[in-house]
Amino acid sequence: MKKIGIFGGTFDPPHNGHLLMANEVLHQAELDEIWFMPNKIPPHKQNEDFTDSRHRVEMLKLAISSNSGFKLELAEMDRKGPSYTYDTVRLLKERHPNDKLFFIIGADMIEYLPKWYKLDELLTLIQFIGVRRPGYHIETPYPLLFADVPEFDVSSTMLRERLKAKEPTQYLMPDKVRQYIEENDLYES
């Protein structure tokens, strides 16, 4: 039985903060693997524009390529419509019935758990790992495991803005991702 952490996100673009968080959770929770799972249409971001799925997947492949504990899971990319965690987890449990699945969420998402689609059913299928960050006070009635991650103040939104303004992004994202973005003229407008 493998212990697998599922790390969902738009990863638009993936950055070193994502990698730092995943690596800390991998070790603190003693997981075998972290599966990076890009969302196609996150329910809480349905009115936003995203970079083409193909580019986000390619950037993510490049970002995680140097860590053997990191894998890519495309279950949500293969589906139509909003990406509800409950539906995805049911599918992954069917595909991997002997593995123990953990779903990784940031401190900012913990307060939104009561609004998650079919949360009570989801809690019977998976264990959540909440990532604590400085500045967030976390209180929740839900049975979460916690991981502490050093503060690394970077976001995909900030990177898109820096890229658009032609500001430096070195050390904020993997060099391979930065090169892919430049070669494919992403985030310029």
From Swiss-Prot:
Catalytic activity: nicotinate beta-D-ribonucleotide + ATP + H(+) = deamido-NAD(+) + diphosphate
Gene3D superfamilies listed in its UniProt record: HUPs (3.40.50.620)
GO molecular function: ATP binding; nicotinate-nucleotide adenylyltransferase activity
EC number of the protein: 2.7.7.18
Pfam family, one: CTP_transf_like
GO biological process entries: NAD biosynthetic process
CDD domains: NMNAT (cd02165)
Domain of life per record: Bacteria
Functional summary from the UniProt entry: Catalyzes the reversible adenylation of nicotinate mononucleotide (NaMN) to nicotinic acid adenine dinucleotide (NaAD).
PANTHER family noted in UniProt: NICOTINATE-NUCLEOTIDE ADENYLYLTRANSFERASE-RELATED (PTHR39321), PHOSPHOPANTETHEINE ADENYLYLTRANSFERASE (PTHR39321:SF3)
Family under the similarity heading: Belongs to the NadD family.
Name of this chain's protein: Probable nicotinate-nucleotide adenylyltransferase
Species for this entry: Bacillus velezensis (strain DSM 23117 / BGSC 10A6 / LMG 26770 / FZB42) (Bacillus amyloliquefaciens subsp. plantarum)
Higher taxonomy: Bacteria, Bacillati, Bacillota, Bacilli, Bacillales
